[in-house]
Amino acid sequence: MTNIRKSHPLIKIINHSFIDLPTPSNISSWWNFGSLLGICLILQILTGLFLAMHYTPDTTTAFSSVAHICRDVNYGWIIRYTHANGASMFFICLFIHVGRGLYYGSYTFLETWNIGTIFLLTLMATAFMGYVLPWGQMSFWGATVITNLLSAIPYIGTDLVEWIWGGFSVDKATLTRFFAFHFILPFIILALAITHLLFLHETGSNNPSGIPSNMDKIPFHPYYTIKDILGALLLILALLTLVLFSPDLLGDPDNYTPANPLSTPPHIKPEWYFLFAYAILRSIPNKLGGVLALAFSILILLIVPSLHTSKQRSMMFRPLSQCVFWLLVADLLTLTWIGGQPVEHPFIIIGQLASILYFSLILVLMPLAGIIENNLLKW
């Protein structure tokens, strides 16, 4: 009798994806973050579903409905803070996952990489719209500032902004549509994640050496299921520590003030995971230029595969490229710090230098390091 997991049409798909999947024997803990992203996504969908049962997308009641969730709903506070901090965990895992892809040359799997980039963009849109929903001061002004950026588009900009707003300012129509999109987008993200996995399993996983590992593969279960469970436990431990001890650590105090269109907060800033892009946006004095730099700071990931000049896939044996990579990490941390600072000296010039360095590292220094290393191999 054949095993049901190998013969049943549905279970067979799960078997080929998570049980009998041939996996390189040498993949490190940096490969754990894919499964952690899956856990984050499921967690966000579940907590979001329960929040949506009690939330009202109306400008007059949105703020008080969030307060009601935290005060009156059974364990509402833990659901709300798990959802808010779960987003932070999601982005931490995602940034590490992308960084791993850059370091070990996983971007040579073109379809997987491109779908991953679309995943990132969709997730950023979802998180932005979710931040607007509590209808606090930072929600309202963040929505106003970020949507207003589209007015920099020539000819159609102003009409486009008013079309997105559903009126002449961020108001009830905006909140309602943001709630609708925030609810539906995670399911689109789920579909993207499945497609991402589908393309990955066509080629098989990369590994730290960047060398094809077809001659040395092991089944995913039990080796990597155990490894992923350990990663998941550490993720949940970190998330629960954040939620139970300092749930507002990554939030903004301004968001505990109800939205007031007549009073602008002293420093308008997005959530921490957007600060690097926000710093790039602010570093360019021209509005259209800033918007283009902001878009390109993420879309640049799509052209990374065509900038690969090295004969080796991974950076494991490429010290020059490693230096450039870690310089990029340090630069992104600097941009994140600058994005949260007021627009004044010396932060303006630091932000401008960090922005120039960001694009220079990816567009010039990384390909250059690859060419130099190729020449060093000849010696």
Curated annotation (Swiss-Prot):
UniProt keyword DNA repair present: no
SUBUNIT field: The cytochrome bc1 complex contains 11 subunits: 3 respiratory subunits (MT-CYB, CYC1 and UQCRFS1), 2 core proteins (UQCRC1 and UQCRC2) and 6 low-molecular weight proteins (UQCRH/QCR6, UQCRB/QCR7, UQCRQ/QCR8, UQCR10/QCR9, UQCR11/QCR10 and a cleavage product of UQCRFS1). This cytochrome bc1 complex then forms a dimer.
Function of the molecule: Component of the ubiquinol-cytochrome c reductase complex (complex III or cytochrome b-c1 complex) that is part of the mitochondrial respiratory chain. The b-c1 complex mediates electron transfer from ubiquinol to cytochrome c. Contributes to the generation of a proton gradient across the mitochondrial membrane that is then used for ATP synthesis.
Miscellaneous comment text of the record: Heme 1 (or BL or b562) is low-potential and absorbs at about 562 nm, and heme 2 (or BH or b566) is high-potential and absorbs at about 566 nm.
Residues that hold a ubiquinone according to the record: H201
Amino-acid positions noted as binding heme b b562 in the UniProt annotation, renumbered to this chain: H83, H182
Transmembrane segment boundaries: 33-53, 77-98, 113-133, 178-198, 226-246, 288-308, 320-340, 347-367
Protein name: Cytochrome b
Subcellular localization: Mitochondrion inner membrane
Residues annotated as binding heme b b566: H97, H196
Protein family according to the UniProt entry: Belongs to the cytochrome b family.
GO CC, any one term: mitochondrial inner membrane
Cofactor(s), names only, from the UniProt record: heme b
SUPFAM superfamilies listed in its UniProt record: a domain/subunit of cytochrome bc1 complex (Ubiquinol-cytochrome c reductase) (SSF81648), Transmembrane di-heme cytochromes (SSF81342)
PROSITE patterns reported for this sequence: CYTB_CTER (PS51003), CYTB_NTER (PS51002)
GO molecular function: metal ion binding; ubiquinol-cytochrome-c reductase activity
Topology versus the membrane: Multi-pass membrane protein
Pfam families: Cytochrom_B_C, Cytochrome_B
Major localisation: mitochondrion
Cofactor: how bound: Binds 2 heme b groups non-covalently.
Gene Ontology BP, a term: mitochondrial electron transport, ubiquinol to cytochrome c
Keywords for the protein's UniProt record, in alphabetical order: Electron transport, Heme, Iron, Membrane, Metal-binding, Mitochondrion, Mitochondrion inner membrane, Respiratory chain, Transmembrane, Transmembrane helix, Transport, Ubiquinone
Species annotation: Dicerorhinus sumatrensis (Sumatran rhinoceros)
